[in-house]
């Protein structure tokens, strides 16, 4: 396990501070109130500016457009850890809304952005509003999203390390599948390996059925049988907390014609999108290309088709028909077309890319084909 100092350099943190403060000035913000909770999709905003990987609910950062950030820790012990291991911030013991509100009052600032409302508990937000009636609160999560979308070279190094763990996980998983084995047993072996190799967090989805429907570890009680289509979805946060996603479908025995055709459609769709992942391309155009590729082949799309990842498992830009974002070099994009099978269930393939001027750079090396066991 890496120490906080090994996860991020001082130069990288200074880069982030500079970019966020530049955006704050453009938005006429004096303070950004950054929240986060320990959940795979709700930690990234706070961690991005603090390097604090395990926030309790309510722990918050007051990030000023100028001056030293202030971290509100839940307990004195946690405040001491932040001060000694992370540094660069003033620490305050206590992270309740009244404590934070009192500090904001002392600054005299009135233009406070919140990042983000979806990572802040409703009662906390309501208390802030009650304690600070004269303060203008606005959600500025998009401000941080814009900064976080484009990864630095340091971040991309850790993204690549995470992708390697995904390939390692799939290699072991493929070797463990056999009739009669329980899903959960197999995935626990995979989790043990990748965590020994430095993964911070692992999030699996799986299925084992002729008509597979994706589920989570709490439902991984099925036993593998001949004729099953088997989902492997591993979203792994590597040694510095950056996620990548690898999705593959395997067949225990020869697949039927419907499954084989759906697998071909998934692969065709991935191949077509590979070349679209360039700077200047709109995410909505990629989404339409995925839908067109699937529907022109006589199938329908199932699960959502893609998104970005980073310190959160699910980040903007999203690959859908509404989050219209122009791709930039060094964005990290996951594409995972899911094709519905007419008889039930679906076929699912996907992986993580880096946007480059030459098209999507594949980070995973695992075979894309429908693996027949």
Which residue stretches match the model-derived regions?
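Active-site neighborhoods and metal-handling regions in enzymes and metal-associated proteins
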Residues: 1-373
